[in-house]
Curated annotation (Swiss-Prot):
Pathway: Antibiotic biosynthesis; granaticin biosynthesis. The keyword Lyase applies. This is dTDP-4-dehydro-6-deoxy-alpha-D-glucopyranose 2,3-dehydratase. It comes from Streptomyces violaceoruber. Keywords: Antibiotic biosynthesis, Lyase. DTDP-4-dehydro-6-deoxy-alpha-D-glucose 2 binds at residues 157, 260, 325, 341-343, 346-347.
Amino acid sequence: MRITDTAGFHAWFAERGAAHRYRITRTPLHDLEGWYTDPASGDVRHRSGRFFSIEGLRYGRQEPDGPAWTQPIIRQPETGVLGVLIKWFDGVPHLLMQAKMEPGNINTLQVSPTVQATFSNYTRVHHGSPVRYIDHFLTPGAGDRVHYDALQSEQGSWFLGKRNRNIVVETTGEIPVHEDFCWVPRPVMAELLRVDNLVNMDSRTVLAGLPDDPGEGSVPRRAVEKPLHDTAALLHWFTGAKVRHRPERTTIPLSRVGGWRRDDDRGEIVHETGRYFRIIGVDVEADSREVTSWSQPMLAPVGRGVVAFVSKEIHGERHLLVQARAEAGTFDAVELGPTVQCNPGNLPDGAPRPPYLDTVLTARPEQVLFDTVHSEEGGRFYHAENRYLVLDGDDVPVDVPEDYTWMTVRQLTRAGRIGNLVDVEARTLLACVRTLPDHGASR
C-alpha cells in the first residue's frame, strides 16, 4: 500500500486498528506467567534468563555535592534493530512504516519503523513468527543502499546501558507490502510528527538520522555555515563535561533499593513518596504480533514530562541550546540532551528548578514553534508521555551555563548520526525540528 496524503494515511491507520484484537490487563507482578522474583536479590526476571530484568542501581557522581540515589532500573543487554526502508516513487522519498501495537501505548496502536525488533524477536527465541523485512537491515541485498547505521542509547533514567541499532536503508527492489505496512511520503511523515501520540519513539529516533534530501523535512543545504562554535570547540566543551560528570554506578539487589517498596496488595513496586514511576505487570493479547500473548513487567511513569529545545538565531543561523546531560543508566555517562528534560512533578520540595524550565513553561504562544505530546517506548514503558516543544528564545542570552552550549541543527544532526552522542529525547526533538520550514535558514 502506498498513500499520497495525510487523509489517506489516517484512513489506512484506522482500518488497521479495526482489523485486529488487542487486550492489555494489569496483573500483579507475582502473578506474571513466566516471570519470578529472585528470592535472594528481589530482582524480577524471566524464567528463561532472556529478555530483560528489573534490578537495583546505586548512582552517584564524584563531583562535590553531586547527587546520589538508588532506584529500580530495566536491564536489557540485548541490542535490537530499528530500521526504516526508503524507496522513491514519482520523485518523492517514501518510508515503509507499520501500524504496530505495543502494550504500553496510551492508545495501543502507533506508527512504528519498518523493523522494530529485539534480538530475541528476530532470532525467534520465543518461537514467534519471522520479523518481516529484517534481511534488508541485517544482510542488505544488491538493490539496497545503507544510508545510516548507528548504535543509539535509549532512556537513561529507566534503562541501564540500553542501546538499539538504528538503520536507514534505501531500496530499489520490489517490496511485497504486508497489510499492516504502508509507504508514507516523507512530507506526510513530517505532518504526522505533529499529531499527539501517533509516531512512536522507535520511529522518531530513526527519523532523526534520515539523510538529507531536497524535499520537505531536510536540513537545508547552505553554501556557508555560520555556527557560533566550530566542531573542535564543541568537542572540547563536551569532553570537559564528561570529565566533570564522572558517575559511579553499581547494580545492587532490588531488595536493597532505598525508598522503594513492594506493594503486595497491588502487586507493584512503588516509591514511598508516590513520585517517579511504578513497576507494574501486564498480561497482553495481540493477534497482530509475532507472539500473540505474553506477560511482562513494565515501568509506569508518574505524570507527564517536559522536553524542550530553546532555539535562537545567531549569525543569521538557527541554533539549539544543547545540554551535556548525565543520567543514571546512560551507556557512556554523558550525552547531548535537550535544553530542558524533566518531569516537573518529580522535583523534590524546595529543590532548585532546572535551568530554563521556567523559560519553557512560561513561553508566549508566538514563541512556540513546535508543541506535541509523544509517547515513549511502549514495549517497556506503560503510558509514558512527554510534551515535546521547540521555542523561539531570541531573548535568551548567548552566554549560558557551563553544561550548555549552542549548536546549529546541522551540527546536532551530524552528532546524532554518529551514535552514543545525542540522547533519545534530543533525537525526537531533532526529528521534529527538521520538519520546521525555516529551522536552519537565516531570515
